[in-house]
Structure formats: C-alpha cells, structure tokens
Amino acid sequence: TAFALGDSGDTFTVPSGATIVNSGTATGFGITAASFRPNAQSLIINGDMQVAQRGTSTASITTSGFYTCDRWNFSISSAGTWTQTQESLTSGDAFADGFSKSIKVDNTTADASLSAGDYVKITYKFEGQDLQLLKKGTANAEKIAVGFWVKATKTGTNILELFDNSNTRQVSQSYTVSSTDTWEYKVV
C-alpha cells in the first residue's frame, strides 16, 4: 500500500528508529529504565543534539547516511529529497526545559508516487554495553520509557519503534502531535 509522505516544503522529524509520518523537529531524546528512578541518566548519547561534527546542515539528501547530529542516522528509500539541519533553539517549551539544539528534517521535494517499501526514518543504534543496566536477555530485564520533545508542522499520529537487531524483534508505540508548530513532550 502506498502512502502520502507530504508536499514539497513539508518538514518531517521522528524519534529514534521511527518512520516519519509527520513533520517538524525533535530534540531531547532520552531512554531510561522504566522504574523511573529520579534523575536517571539517559541511555542515548547526544540525545540533546549538541554535537554535530559532520556539519550543521546538509541539503539535497536522497540516500541514507549520518549528516548532522552525531549518532543519528538518516535512512531513506526512494522517498523524495530532504534537508537535515542542527537547529538552534531560542524559545519554546523544549528551550525552557534546557534544550538549545534540535535535529530538523525538511522534505524539499516530495515523491508523488511512493510505494509500500519507501520510507524515511531517523535511527539511533545502541551498543550492547550501553544497555547492560537494563539486564536485557535475563529474567530480570527492565522495562524502558522513551521521552522526547517534538515540534511538527502537522498534527497526527506518529510511531516510535524499537528494534532488537540481535533477536529480530520489534515493538511499536504511537504518540500524537496535538498542535502545529508547538514543542510537545512525549513519553512512550
């Protein structure tokens, strides 16, 4: 089944590992053990999008790769042309919460004939040692929660997906963007 990804000029941003179904920017990604320990440290390195050693903007993206914010991969399969930037925040709830940078993905040329296998997503890959505190693979494995800020040019339902590459398992959870051009904090 084909789906519409948007019009030229629309901006699409999603959290780690999710497929883009909306538009906007995102920052402040964090995954912590779901026991919700006060002040638990995020398991995501550069979730605040502060580090962009490759540069702060790349235009005319049509292939997968690491373009701006370190550790965040942009994956694409026949889905138009994109620009990715590391944005500086100066206002809004995410800025007020202490975030000064975000990753932004802008659809500059839409693909008018998407097929079922076409996609655009932003992914973050953990290394095994990064997840040791979750006791993955044991009877005492801990649950996790993913919290992030998102700002979109369109409202609607989006999907965050976690994929276990070692065991070829995945879990998806939806979240809703309620207001356009407004930073919203989501926990899934």
Can you say where each PLM-predicted feature lies in the sequence?
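Intrinsic low-complexity, repeat-rich intrinsically disordered segments enriched
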Residues: 1-39
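Extracellular and organelle-lumenal recognition/adhesion modules and their flexible linkers in secreted
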Residues: 28-188
